[in-house]
Amino acid sequence: DSLAKDSNAAPAISSAQLIAGGDKYVAEFDSTTVTGFLKAYKVKDDGDFEASPTWEAGAKLLETGSNARKIITNYGNGTSAGVAFRWDSLPADYQTQVQTGGAITVSAANAPKVVAYVRGDQSLEGLNGLRQRDGSLLGPIVNGTPWIQGPPSAEIYGSTGYADFFAKNKARQRVLWVPANDGMLHAFNVTTGEELFAYVPGALANRLVEIPLQRGTTARTKLAGANFTSGATENQPTGTVWPYVDGNPFTADVKVTSGADSVWRTYLLGTLGRGGKAVYALDVSMSADPLTTDPAVSYLSESNAASIFKWQFTSDDDADLGY
């Protein structure tokens, strides 16, 4: 395979795994099709794991309409930086970054199609279109390791305000966070494999156009004529898996205000890894909601984008920030 600078040089099929709570979660990728797979296996009575997975998240995403998915992004920092990842919801400057901000530019008519493709719209795929995603909508999971977010820990129970936070959140569901090189950090239901939510780091805005143009060794990407891109044409080498959200996420309980009325939240911290020079933070507290037995469904939503996204720190903030 031809491998480009900053690409992920890896075998055609590779995998990493996480074992937690009697389940095994295996993340795989296939560079020949530029796709990823996330499989869950149940433990058997003899302590070994079932041979067949309970669910596979990439295939489940194919069953979910792109419009139904809950995906957010951000433009810069600030209290209103978090927005829904839908073309009409993006600030004008973000739209400009998608269209002309990177090495590959697209027309004003095609820029919204980039966002639609990343969201999972498959209408542009085909022999005369963009890269086909036949078996999975999940991107390659290469260097990033899945992370399970559980209820708050009792280890800091004595800290001011934490007892109340613990009581409100001790029954919250576990969430499986997975970074993927489809430009997203995904949140999955650990029991069903359904996607609960996804986040597209705003630092990737000017590179999103690359995602539908990647080719696997099956060479199934053919540009829609010569009109999808303007200026530079497709330049991703065959068989290359380019990194986007390629770093490890983790969650921790954080005291966001001090004093007698201390407030605690659960934050997720993540990086782009080899995908770029950026660190981000999300508020994923998912406090119990009396209106639903599934708090992740009610809190992790596009309407809460401004509350979920907290901040990003990139090489624009500090030139010494590395990969």
How should each PLM-predicted stretch be described?
Residues 1-323:
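A fold-level detector for beta-propeller and closely related beta-sheet-rich head/sensor domains
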